[in-house]
Design a protein with these regions (language model features):
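Anion (oxyanion) recognition and catalysis
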Residues: 194
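Generic structural signal for well-ordered alpha-helices
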Residues: 118, 186-190, 222
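Conserved radical SAM core fold
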Residues: 207-209
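Extracellular and organelle-lumenal recognition/adhesion modules and their flexible linkers in secreted
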Residues: 1-181, 197-203, 214-220
Length: 222
C-alpha cells in the first residue's frame, strides 16, 4: 500500500512517443486488486518533454480477477517526445499487466496495425517481396531467445515477450527497452504483405543461433 506520492509507471516509448493533437489513442491494460481490497483509482496521463500534462483520464480497478480496462486519450497538443504515465490516485495495491497505447489511425485502419505514414511510404515503393521479421533477429543470442513464430500469433496479450538481438546497444540504460513485445507478429506481417501488394517471404529459425553471439556460439549445434 502506497501513500499518494505519484507512485506509478512512466514509459518513454522509443526515445519518446509521437502524439498528434486531436487524434485518438486507445489505452488499455489488464489489472486486478488484492483479495478483499477496496477499488483502486489510476490516473492515465500523457505528458510532454517538459513534463507538462496535456491529457488525463481515470480508471477504477476492482476485483481480484484480471480484467481489461480501456480509455481513449485525445491529446490537446502535438508532441514528438511525450511519455505515458500511470499513477495511483488512491491508496491500495494493484497488479498491472499488458499495458498498451495505440493510435486509432493506422494503415488501412487495421487494429494493431502499422503506422500509417511509414506503411504508405513503403507501399508507394511498390515492393515485389516483403521479408520478415529479419535475419539475425530470428537466430537470437542463443536457442532460448530464437524467434519462434508460434509465439507471435493469437491474442496480443498472450504473446510472450522476447529479448531483441540488438538490445545490447542500450547498455547505458538500467532497463534496456529494446525488447520484442510480438504485438507485431506473423499474422500482421502476412496481412501487411497483402496490403502493400508484395509477396511475403517469412524467415524461420533453423535451430542454429548466431555464430557471432558473445558466449552463445552454436550452442552445441554443428
Amino acid at each position: 500500500e502506497k501513500e499518494l506520492t505519484g507512485t506509478g509507471l512512466d514509459n518513454e516509448g522509443f526515445n519518446g512517443i509521437g502524439i498528434r493533437e486531436g487524434e485518438k489513442y486507445d489505452f488499455s491494460l489488464y489489472a486486478r486488486t488484492r483479495s478483499g481490497d477496496a477499488p483502486v483509482k489510476l490516473r492515465i496521463n500523457l505528458v510532454d518533454s517538459r513534463n507538462d500534462l496535456y491529457e488525463q483520464k481515470e480508471i477504477e480497478v476492482s476485483g481480484k480477477e484480471w480484467k481489461k480496462y480501456t480509455v481513449v486519450l485525445t491529446p490537446g497538443a502535438t508532441e514528438a517526445r511525450s511519455r505515458l504515465r500511470i499513477t495511483m490516485a488512491t491508496k491500495g495495491t494493484v497488479d498491472l499487466e499488458h499495458i498498451s497505447l495505440f493510435p486509432q489511425k493506422t494503415f488501412n485502419n487495421r487494429p494493431n496495425g502499422m503506422r500509417a505514414d511509414l506503411a504508405q511510404a513503403l507501399k508507394d515503393l511498390k515492393p515485389g517481396v516483403f521479408r520478415f521479421p529479419g535475419g539475425c533477429i530470428v537466430e537470437g543470442t542463443n536457442k532460448a531467445t530464437r524467434y519462434q513464430w508460434k509465439n507471435t500469433v493469437g491474442p496480443v496479450e498472450n504473446r510472450p515477450i522476447n529479448i531483441n538481438r540488438w538490445n545490447y546497444t542500450f547498455s547505458h540504460k538500467k532497463f534496456p527497452d529494446y525488447y520484442q513485445s510480438c504485438g507485431l507478429g506473423f499474422f500482421e506481417y502476412f496481412q501487411f504483405s497483402e496490403d502493400i501488394g508484395a509477396e511475403p517471404v517469412p524467415v524461420i529459425a533453423a535451430g542454429v543461433c548466431c555464430q557471432n553471439s558473445r558466449g552463445g556460439g552454436q550452442q552445441g549445434v554443428p
